[in-house]
């Protein structure tokens, strides 16, 4: 049976001291691509989606794209914008089920009104949808946080190594390589905090 993977992007870098709030228009002005409409050129947090296209095609896998949304760094995301984008992605994931894995492009330093850890919230919902036996992985910026919610929901993640972040394509390729090795049973990644 052909393996099936869902991918999506939801990212920004929040500065909690900034008075400039991010609403839905902030994402639409920077990057908002509906499923299957992301350009071929990868962006900082969307490289897993674009690199995954060739990865899946080469292996004969089905690559189901969800929304890709990025807002330029600013202050808090308003609650309505975060929840609407989160729910859009979750609805797309539900429609794509069953899947063998979820591959995400995240930043890791988002904060929204009412959510200190939006990525942890998103990942928790994703894990609830896919269950414990589906691989969930993501790329992160090195400025990201690693909360307990993220540790519990992720099978593994890869963070950018370079500053400036010129290695986002290579890190997406690393993520997909680890996914390959996990699917083959060669590795069993785990995430921990010490």
Across the structure, where does each feature detected by a protein language model lie?
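Conserved beta-strand segments of alpha/beta enzyme cores
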Residues: 62-64, 156
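Well-ordered alpha-helical segments embedded in enzymatic catalytic cores
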Residues: 51, 84-89
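Flexible, glycine/charged-enriched surface loops at secondary-structure junctions
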Residues: 186-194
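Short, glycine/charge-rich beta-strand/loop segments that flank catalytic centers
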Residues: 68-73, 104-106, 144, 193-194
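N-terminal amphipathic/basic leader segments beginning at the initiator methionine
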Residues: 1-58
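Active-site histidine-anchored catalytic micro-motif
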Residues: 6, 10-13, 79-86, 94-187
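Glycine/alanine-rich phosphate-binding loops at beta-alpha junctions
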Residues: 56-61, 77
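Charged, often glycine-rich, active-site loop that binds/positions anionic groups
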Residues: 65-86
